[in-house]
Amino acid sequence: MARVTVQDAVEKIGNRFDLVLVAARRARQLQTGGKDPLVAEENDKVTVIALREVEEGLINGKILDVRERQEQQEQEAAEMQAVSAIAESRR
C-alpha cells in the first residue's frame, strides 16, 4: 500500500480546501455511484483511492464536472426517449 502524501495532492488541485471537496466527491462516486477506480485498489479505502487518483492527476474538479454533466445529459436523453415511447403507445 503506497502512502499518499496530501501535499502532493494539494499541488495538483491548488489548495487543500478544494482538495477536500474533490476527493470527497470522488470517494462518494466510488462508494455509491458504481464508479470504477482509476488506480489499483490495493485494499485501500475509497478516500485513499480518491486521493491517489488526484495525486496521479487522473481526477480534478473539472474532470468530475464534465463527467457528471455527460452522465446527466445521457440520463435526460434516456428519460425523454422513455416519455416519447409512452406517448406513442397511448396514441
UniProtKB/Swiss-Prot annotation:
Keywords: DNA-directed RNA polymerase, Nucleotidyltransferase, Transcription, Transferase. SMART domains: RNA_pol_Rpb6. The keyword Transcription applies. Coiled coil: none annotated. It catalyses: RNA(n) + a ribonucleoside 5'-triphosphate = RNA(n+1) + diphosphate. Pfam families: RNA_pol_Rpb6 (PF01192). Its EC number is 2.7.7.6. One of its GO terms (cellular component) is DNA-directed RNA polymerase complex. One of its GO terms (biological process) is DNA-templated transcription. One of its GO terms (molecular function) is DNA-directed RNA polymerase activity. The RNAP catalytic core consists of 2 alpha, 1 beta, 1 beta' and 1 omega subunit. When a sigma factor is associated with the core the holoenzyme is formed, which can initiate transcription. Belongs to the RNA polymerase subunit omega family. Promotes RNA polymerase assembly. Latches the N- and C-terminal regions of the beta' subunit thereby facilitating its interaction with the beta and alpha subunits. This is DNA-directed RNA polymerase subunit omega. It comes from Photorhabdus laumondii subsp. laumondii (strain DSM 15139 / CIP 105565 / TT01).
